[in-house]
């Protein structure tokens, strides 16, 4: 059924199709036509959290937490919403989202378009979702990069009571200079400030909410080693590898290869896995990794687990394969676990 729906959706503008799909999913959910499945097929512990299974939804699909309940009915082990910023912002001018079906890729330069952290919290409070919910936080475009920590601290404080875990997004290529925060000194200063605030908030709220950081696939081994050193030294709870790539050489002479933005889907698969493997080697089991990037079928999820991830997230694969991808990943992980025995 989804291949037919995809043909119709792919005839629409990519961003319009995105909103139409989520609105339709929400309507079907509210009509009770989506059977809520727990999918406790492969429970796993992640950052101290009990996941019913290790296949999660990556940030970016539901930026404002408007579709949490409907997405929660699709069998994910956890859901991540955002990226959210302190204040609402429109993001970059349209068009800013492009499909590259010949390569099973997506290019986006959305620019953290969202309604702001306060609106997101209102949506979370209206939700009935009781599963593991991650909130992905970023900085406003107008905030100077030297003041970025202020924005992350605002979001952390406001999101803390409503999140199962919080992800610090420093790897989007669509906010000017954001990726500079991945550098050693800048990264250390930012994460130390956030860990200090986390400790204060844990005392105030009487609960510990884990902090993860999301990194880019466009890193060399020295940069990956530096990041691994920092996240271990500040005692981050987890790391997400990876975001989208700015390298579009895999698209060859495709007309969209010159578009600005981050490329996701199948073209980022190898880059993401390379970073994941190197990161796992340098982290040496000190904190868990969530693998994301280029999971287009079940065996891709199993490969990320073999490379060192504790859990995985999907996004672009959902656009191309539909919700059935979740079950396909879970089946592949189960087969992989059996073969390893």
Curated annotation (Swiss-Prot):
Its cofactor is FMN. Pathway: Pyrimidine metabolism; UMP biosynthesis via de novo pathway; orotate from (S)-dihydroorotate (quinone route): step 1/1. It is found in: Cell membrane. It catalyses: (S)-dihydroorotate + a quinone = orotate + a quinol. It is a peripheral membrane protein. The active site is at 172 (nucleophile). GO terms for biological process: 'de novo' pyrimidine nucleobase biosynthetic process; 'de novo' UMP biosynthetic process. Disulfide bonds: none annotated. Keywords: Cell membrane, Flavoprotein, FMN, Membrane, Oxidoreductase, Pyrimidine biosynthesis. Belongs to the dihydroorotate dehydrogenase family. Type 2 subfamily. Monomer. Catalyzes the conversion of dihydroorotate to orotate with quinone as electron acceptor. This is Dihydroorotate dehydrogenase (quinone).
């Amino acid at each position: 059924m989804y291949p037919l729906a995809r043909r119709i959706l792919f005839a629409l503008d990519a961003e319009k199709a995105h909103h139409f799909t989520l609105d339709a999913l929400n309507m079907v959910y509210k009509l009770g036509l989506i059977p809520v499945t727990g999918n406790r097929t492969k429970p796993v512990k992640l950052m101290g959290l009990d996941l019913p299974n290790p296949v999660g939804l990556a940030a970016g699909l539901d930026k404002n937490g408007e579709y949490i309940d409907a997405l929660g009915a699709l069998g994910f082990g956890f859901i991540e919403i955002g990226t959210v910023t302190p204040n609402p912002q429109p993001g970059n001018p349209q068009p800013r989202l492009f499909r590259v079906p010949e390569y099973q890729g997506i290019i986006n330069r959305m620019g953290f378009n969202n309604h702001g952290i306060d609106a997101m919290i209102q949506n979370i409070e209206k939700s009935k979702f009781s599963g593991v919910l991650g909130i992905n936080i970023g900085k406003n475009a107008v905030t100077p990069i030297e003041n970025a920590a202020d924005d992350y601290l605002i979001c952390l404080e406001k999101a803390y009571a409503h999140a199962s875990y919080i992800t610090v997004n420093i790897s989007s290529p669509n906010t000017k200079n954001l990726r500079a925060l991945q550098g050693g000194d800048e990264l250390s200063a930012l994460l130390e400030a956030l860990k200090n605030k986390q400790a204060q908030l844990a005392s105030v709220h009487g609960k510990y909410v884990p902090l993860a950081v999301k990194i880019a696939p466009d890193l060399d081994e020295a940069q990956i080693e530096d990041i691994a050193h920092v996240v271990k030294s500040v005692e981050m709870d987890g790391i997400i590898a990876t975001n989208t790539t700015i390298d579009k050489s895999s698209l060859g002479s495709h007309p969209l290869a010159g578009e600005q933005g981050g490329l996701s889907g199948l073209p980022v698969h190898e880059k993401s896995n390379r970073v994941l493997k190197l990161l796992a080697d340098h982290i040496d089991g000190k904190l868990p990794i969530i693998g994301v990037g280029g999971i287009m079928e079940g065996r891709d999820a199993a490969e990320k687990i073999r490379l060192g991830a504790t859990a995985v997230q999907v996004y672009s694969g959902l656009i191309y394969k539909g919700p059935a991808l979740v079950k396909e990943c879970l089946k592949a992980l189960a087969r992989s676990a059996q073969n390893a025995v």
